[in-house]
A protein has these predicted regions:
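Structural signature of hydrophobic alpha-helical transmembrane segments
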Residues: 4-16, 60-75
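C-terminal ends of transmembrane helices
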Residues: 21-31, 77-88
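Transmembrane alpha-helices
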Residues: 173-199
Length: 268
């Protein structure tokens, strides 16, 4: 039995469910109504666009076009990470982009080439979905980690300088802040891994089962998706912090102004 298609009429009926959260958002005057409507509209337009684009990506199955698509995803993810953490693009755009690129390529290629043993590692059927899953799942944890790391450094500069003044290397002085970033960013992911299959069925597994794969195949893919996501997220963070530290600190170890200061409007 193949996957049951959702007609456009059925899709419209399904979208009516949004009226429930929209009602409560409006009723309690949260101020989120406009943002929710815009976000939903963007999601619909973007997904339809991606659906059309992916159709031709799979049809052409060209390695160069596939890799170009991954580069576009990395640039968008880097810009999103910078925007969500309020970090300066001039200083951190390259470290963040390189962190995404290196981790996604290394871990993604390891999975496709060594674990799946595909002859054509750039096959659109596997290359695009795997890299897309990695990018999507890495983004939130990396945003939390970057925000925690730089906010901690900015808030606890005296501790950082104290450690440097007492003979610690720059790497040793940064260790407490990296530790906090890892704890805050990866604790939810670890908790999610520990209850996988008991409390929640992940989207990848459900998608494969709906697509006709056996539960055993879907389970093994889901295991690997969690492993490669966890690994790529950690590798990306370490690469990013290592590269960013060269621009984030001056010759004396002082943190440069890497975060965009929010302007406070003065009252008339």
């Amino acid at each position: 039995m193949g996957t049951i298609d959702i007609s456009y009429l059925s899709l419209g009926i399904g979208l009516l469910l949004l009226l429930i959260p929209l009602f409560y958002i409006w009723k309690f005057k949260t101020g989120l109504l406009r943002a929710t409507l815009i976000g939903t509209a963007r999601m619909i337009v973007q997904l339809f666009f991606i659906g059309v684009y992916l159709k031709y990506l799979f049809l052409w199955n060209n390695p160069w076009i596939n890799f170009l698509w991954v580069i576009v995803m990395i640039l968008v993810a880097s810009q999103t990470a910078l925007a969500r953490t309020q970090l300066k693009r001039k200083i951190l755009l390259i470290p963040i982009s390189v962190g995404f690129l290196c981790s996604v390529v290394c871990v993604g290629m390891y999975f496709i080439g060594i674990v799946l043993r595909l002859e054509n590692v750039f096959s659109a059927q596997y290359f695009i979905p795997i890299f897309g899953i990695l990018m999507g799942n890495m983004l939130s944890s990396n945003v939390i980690a970057l925000n925690t790391y730089y906010s901690g450094l900015k808030r606890e500069q005296q501790l950082y300088r104290y450690l440097l003044g007492n003979g610690a290397t720059r790497t040793e002085a940064q260790a407490p802040f990296i530790r906090q970033a890892i704890i805050k960013a990866f604790s939810p992911l670890i908790a999610n891994i520990s209850v996988m299959g008991l409390v929640a069925f992940p989207g990848t597994m459900i998608g494969q089962i709906l697509g006709g794969s056996s539960p055993n195949v879907a389970i093994k893919y889901q295991m690997m998706i969690m492993v490669i996501t966890f690994t790529a997220s950690m590798l990306s963070l370490m690469i990013r912090i290592s590269l960013a530290s060269r621009k984030s600190f001056d010759a004396y170890g002082k943190l440069r102004p890497v975060m965009v200061e929010k302007k406070v409007k003065s009252k008339p």
